Amino acid sequence: MVAVRGAHLKENTTFELVSWVESLRQDAKVSSRIEGTYQRCIELAAEQENGPLLLWRGRELVEILVTLSMDADTLIAALLYPLVEGGCYSTDALKEEYSGTILHLVQGVEQMCAISQLKSTAEETAQAAQVDNIRRMLLSMVDDFRCVVIKLAERICNLREVKDQPDEVRRAAAQECANIYAPLANRLGIGQLKWEIEDYAFRYQHPDTYKQIAKQLSERRIDREDYITHFVDDLSDAMKASNIRAEVQGRPKHIYSIWRKMQKKSLEFDELFDVRAVRIVAEELQDCYAALGVVHTKYRHLPKEFDDYVANPKPNGYQSIHTVVLGPEGKTIEIQIRTKQMHEESELGVAAHWKYKEGTASGGAQSAYDEKINWLRKLLAWQEEMSDSGEMLDELRSQVFDDRVYAFTPKGDVVDLPSNATPLDFAYHIHSEVGHRCIGAKVEGRIVPFTYHLQMGDQVEIITQKEPNPSRDWLNPNLGFVTSSRARAKVHAWFRKQDRDKNIIAGKEILEAELVKIHATLKDAQYYAAKRFNVKSPEELYAGIGSGDLRINQVINHINALVNKPTAEEEDQQLLEKLSEASNKQATSHKKPQRDAVVVEGVDNLMTHLARCCQPIPGDDIQGFVTQGRGISVHRMDCEQLEELRHHAPERIIDTVWGGGFVGNYTITVRVTASERNGLLKELTNTLMNEKVKVAGMKSRVDYKKQMSIMDFELELTDLEVLGRVLKRIEQVKDVAEAKRLYG
């Protein structure tokens, strides 16, 4: 017996909606919802050239999901999804007409498209966009598995649909499903979808082998089915004679599983045990072992082929007793023995758990948490399997899974955090007030310190007090209380709102303690930091440090660089030696000097580097500053730091111009200010990709007061002309208010 489910896409056939809805065998309320939704789908698809195809896809999805006993919301979402994907129906309109659950499911299926985009790319911005998409997809998957089941059904529809397409189209669809979706269906234990995905993929990837096995099965089908019928009758009589409540039935075999066993065990078709297969479905667990006793008493079994997956379930939860016996005429027969619940779970997987849970409130929050932990483990196992297939880039896999932590609230809600996140990061992710009032945390019921690094799947409970009381120590990166920029920004915001006098006192104490370490004074701090950090008074400097607006390490590093700089004599001596060496080489060499990016006072071949503070690029007016041990530091003419250096050490200033023979990239920072909206980052990165500009890094923050998003991109450009063009292109993107270059 071989399982076959054909494609149902037919042209020029009359579709009867009422008859179709009745064939789904749902209750009156669900049937009414399905019929009403389909009428709406007809309206939406009426103006579309491919409208009939979209309607067919929706019907196919529903028919597959009904066999999995999925709930009404899942069926409605499945009907609507092809129309949303096809552009007939916007998510905004969907939100207005249907419940939030329907919208959530449709968007979850959409986000799973991120899997199909996991193609190798050298573009860092493209990789970043993929990582962001996959994170959102994982959150949807962990939060509600139903979107995954819809996606699996949708892939089966696609495999059916491409049946008559060119060979390369079928092979591409088959490879994606074999590498990604079949392992996912397996991890979720949905055998009913797994076998169809595998058989279609095998049929398209290895058509000759598929036809050969199908032909061999067909040639002996009648004899084999007669044999199985007699065997089932004999075994059923034996079960009744022993008062065992069990149903004996022939078991369908799948061509892919037959081929895989032939490959794995190096067997010919005639040597396979499970071409002849029987299943015994018992009422209770004790009946399973009683049935096994009857089987082994009546027929001789092969000990090496016995497996007890009831006592030792497979990783995906599969349970069954497997045995192989010698039946009449000495022919081998594979027998599976399981309970009704085990059988349903092996066919429906996680969908079976939904079926049992629906309509009950048992288990509560802990049950929801346990379910999601188990579900998360399955997803992590699946991504390992998927990466083994070579389909997922190792770097992307690391960014998605190794650089993120998925933790849970006591109610089972999933929280996506960066790796090394702490309980305080978790608290501030939930809500600002939860973070401000946090005085402790429990992980898995145990008290943990604020420096504890959350692990994948941790259940976190935050302990709070009535009044908010954050500590300034939370802002110290060396202490490790807070690691996420989101949490740090919320702590900063709290301290900014507090009494200014307290911030001044605290900031002064912090600054004095750090100045001692670099042998500097408050007077040095006031002199060197005022202009650099745009503070007009010592009190403003202290208040900025105390509130967290000014990073103490940035202030100290800036002061240290100016207070403890090398003497002029030391730098002059090194420069003289360098110039002398360069002159000697030029005098003794008959080769033409190699031109560099920057020419110093007409002398080539000197060591220069571009200052990070102002990031000059070709086209900028520039000037050099003699440093200790690092040659000439090249600045923009209007650089604020260069202005300070002119004032304090004018003898080290040297004229420089751009050389003519250098071709390469220069790193500059571009700040983009824009209104917050979904898809903005993707449009910006696409714009930069179209301009063939490499993104070396990106940081972003939100100005909540102005409701604007501020993004700083580190770009690698060749010259000022390219920069001007890039800024113009960015400002043409919708909702971008300003794009400008930062000078330090």
From Swiss-Prot:
| Gene source species | Photobacterium angustum (strain S14 / CCUG 15956) (Vibrio sp. (strain S14 / CCUG 15956))
Q: Which GO terms describe its cellular component?
A: plasma membrane
**PROSITE patterns listed in its UniProt record:** ACT, HD, TGS
**Sorted alphabetically, which InterPro entries does this protein's record hold?**
ACT-like_dom_sf, ACT_dom, Beta-grasp_dom_sf, HD_domain, NT_sf, RelA/Spo_fam, RelA/SpoT_AH_RIS, RelA_SpoT
Family the entry assigns:
Belongs to the RelA/SpoT family.
Protein name (record): GTP pyrophosphokinase
Keywords recorded for this protein, A-Z: ATP-binding, GTP-binding, Kinase, Nucleotide-binding, Transferase
Q: Which SUPFAM superfamilies match?
A: ACT-like, HD-domain/PDEase-like, Nucleotidyltransferase, TGS-like
UniProt key word Heme = no
Cross-referenced Pfam families? ACT_4 (PF13291), HD_4 (PF13328), RelA_AH_RIS (PF19296), RelA_SpoT (PF04607), TGS (PF02824)
CDD domains this protein is in?
ACT_RelA-SpoT, NT_Rel-Spo_like, TGS_RSH
Domain named ACT: residues? 669-744
Organism domain of life: Bacteria
